[in-house]
């Protein structure tokens, strides 16, 4: 390869990446997921568009695995362990039982539609059986979904790849060897994938944490060290026949939930690297497909995609979540709809091509078509479906910016900046009147781009910018402090007519609003009553019905319900009650 060819490759690569970034700005205007736009750029530049011929499947496999490792590492770093209290076991059930059921249901229909053997149909089902972390992390961000739904979908997408990879590799081996029966050794293989992946991920994350916190480097090198360490964990786990995808996700989870040096620098750079990984991966996958090859299979492939979206995924979700009573029908419906397929199925579809199986090109084209339909149909309608099924909650007021204060190696101090608009209740109040959360301090006050030297008597005005020092766990309290109403920062349109304290006794609440206890313990706290009704770990937005009234979890303090909203039937509204 001469210098001219190398320069041409650099130019083409840079133009494609740049075009993807620029065109992605149309995503929000058109309501189309960014990943679809990037795929489209790759397809337009490919053999049926710009004429770039790319059919190197091993290279696509390499790029795809590298990109997914970076994306999963970034996803793990941003996942809060606290969310596991409501979603760990349901997500694992979806990642195992759900994938198995989806594979079986999809495989049977695929075999019938394309006149294949059952085992070939099941291979198609396995290839497209798992949700994609890149698609889920990208499309769920900023949608305001309740914690149970968000955590379940994110943990599922980060942990269901081992099952899909295991099923795909197993079925390829069976087809290649002519084997038609299953053996108990397959279960051992699956347990080994999960076991080694889990141990390597947790152990590798702990070792990386010790290394980052003990070694002194230039600030810009810590993110690179974390990425390198994540890739080491990923590759070593694969070499030991474990799940590298699960391992790198857990490695990020450990690093993201412990005090770590240069935390904000790591997260900031990983965000950019994850975006680059997504762009590069979907560009390569777009180049890899030949669009005119999709036309002959378009009708049956569309039928298979719709079967997955409307039947296979919902049935698998209902079955997998059957033991978990906390999930309402609306939440199950939304989780069913967000069975987003992305890069993983396309990468898994490369496996049969590399193994030289008959009909391997059909498997690849089918996987690509299903991914395209999934992103266009499910990804585009996600915000609308969230509103329809009422799984969103009002967002907490957030600072306009936040930055780290690295006063020591593992410092978790941050600087939060709040801009005070005309709707803020604290306008006209003196600083001494603000009940700041314990452990926080106002560090600076800017007014009309000028730094003031505030005192307790300084009165806040519209447009002021407050700089507050605190920790991440102070954000909910600070958000309420700088909300739109004095002690009514909660969105009453969502939570109800009144908001009650969670420790209010049920007997007092019933007497106040003329409700019947029906044998319930009058001394029972309202929070405990709602927890029992929910049937699992509650989250903000959970609702129950009692005597025609709707009771909504409004504020959580860890695992404890702190405030509850109550909405009465239309035309009825009791007295002031315990209005807060």
Curated annotation (Swiss-Prot):
Chief place where the protein resides: membrane
Gene Ontology biological process terms from the UniProt entry: cell volume homeostasis
Residues in RCK C-terminal domain copies: 402-484
Residues passing through the membrane, by range: 6-26, 34-54, 57-77, 86-106, 108-128, 162-182, 193-213, 217-237, 240-260, 269-289, 292-312, 334-354, 362-382
Matching Gene3D superfamilies: 1.20.1530.20, 3.30.465.10, Regulator of K+ conductance, C-terminal domain
PROSITE patterns named among the record's database cross-references: RCK_C
Pfam families: CorC_HlyC, Na_H_Exchanger, TrkA_C
Protein name (Swiss-Prot/TrEMBL): K(+)/H(+) antiporter NhaP2
């Amino acid at each position: 390869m001469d210098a001219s060819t190398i320069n041409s490759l650099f130019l083409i690569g840079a133009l494609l990446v740049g075009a993807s970034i620029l065109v992605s700005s149309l995503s929000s205007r058109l309501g189309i997921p960014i990943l679809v736009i990037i795929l489209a750029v790759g397809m337009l530049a490919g053999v049926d568009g710009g004429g770039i011929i790319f059919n190197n499947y091993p290279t696509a496999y390499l790029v795809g695995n590298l990109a997914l490792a970076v994306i999963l590492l970034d996803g793990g770093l941003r996942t809060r362990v606290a969310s596991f209290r409501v979603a760990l076991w349901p997500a694992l059930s979806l990642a195992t039982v759900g994938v198995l059921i989806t594979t079986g249901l999809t495989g049977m229909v695929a075999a019938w539609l394309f006149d294949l053997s059952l085992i070939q149909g099941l291979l198609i089902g396995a290839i497209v059986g798992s949700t994609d972390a890149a698609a889920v992390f990208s499309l769920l961000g900023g949608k305001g979904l309740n914690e149970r739904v968000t955590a379940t979908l994110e943990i599922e997408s980060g942990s269901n790849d081992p099952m899909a990879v295991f099923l795909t590799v197993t079925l390829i081996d069976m087809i290649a060897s002519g084997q038609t029966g299953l053996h108990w050794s397959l279960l051992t293989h699956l347990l080994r994938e999960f076991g080694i992946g889990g141990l390597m991920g947790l152990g590798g994350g702990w070792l990386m944490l010790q290394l980052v916190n003990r070694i002194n480097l230039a600030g810009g090198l810590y993110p690179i060290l974390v990425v390198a360490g994540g890739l080491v964990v990923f590759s070593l786990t694969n070499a030991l026949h474990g799940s590298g995808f699960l391992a790198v996700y857990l490695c990020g989870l450990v690093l993201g939930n412990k005090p770590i040096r240069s935390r904000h620098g790591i997260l900031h750079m990983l965000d950019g690297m994850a975006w680059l990984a997504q762009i590069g991966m979907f560009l390569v996958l777009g180049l890899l497909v030949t669009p005119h090859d999709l036309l002959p299979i378009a009708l049956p492939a569309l039928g298979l995609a719709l079967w997955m979206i409307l039947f296979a995924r919902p049935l698998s979700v209902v079955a997998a979540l059957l033991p978990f009573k906390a999930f309402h029908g609306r939440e199950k419906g939304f989780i069913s709809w967000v069975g987003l397929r992305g890069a993983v199925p396309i990468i898994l579809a490369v496996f049969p091509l590399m193994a030289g199986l008959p009909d391997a090109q059909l498997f690849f084209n089918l996987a690509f078509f299903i991914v395209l339909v999934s992103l266009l149909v499910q990804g585009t309608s996600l915000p609308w479906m969230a509103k329809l099924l009422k799984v969103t909650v009002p967002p907490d007021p957030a600072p306009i910016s936040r930055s780290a204060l690295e006063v020591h190696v593992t410092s978790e101090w941050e600087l939060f900046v709040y801009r005070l608009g005309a709707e803020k209740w604290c306008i006209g109040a003196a600083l001494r009147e603000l009940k700041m959360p314990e452990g926080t301090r106002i560090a600076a006050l800017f007014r009309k781009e000028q730094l003031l030297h505030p005192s307790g008597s300084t009165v806040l005005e519209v447009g002021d910018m407050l700089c507050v020092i605190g920790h991440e766990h102070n954000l909910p309290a600070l958000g309420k402090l700088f909300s739109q109403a004095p002690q009514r920062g909660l969105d009453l349109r969502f939570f109800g007519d009144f908001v009650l304290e969670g420790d209010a006794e049920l007997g007092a609440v019933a007497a106040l609003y003329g409700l019947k206890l029906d044998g319930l313990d009058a001394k029972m706290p309202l929070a405990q009553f709602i927890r029992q009704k929910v049937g699992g770990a509650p989250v903000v937005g959970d609702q129950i019905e009692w005597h025609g009234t709707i009771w909504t979890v409004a504020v959580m303090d860890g695992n404890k319900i702190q405030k509850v909203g109550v909405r009465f039937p239309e035309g009825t509204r009791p007295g002031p009650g315990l209005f807060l």
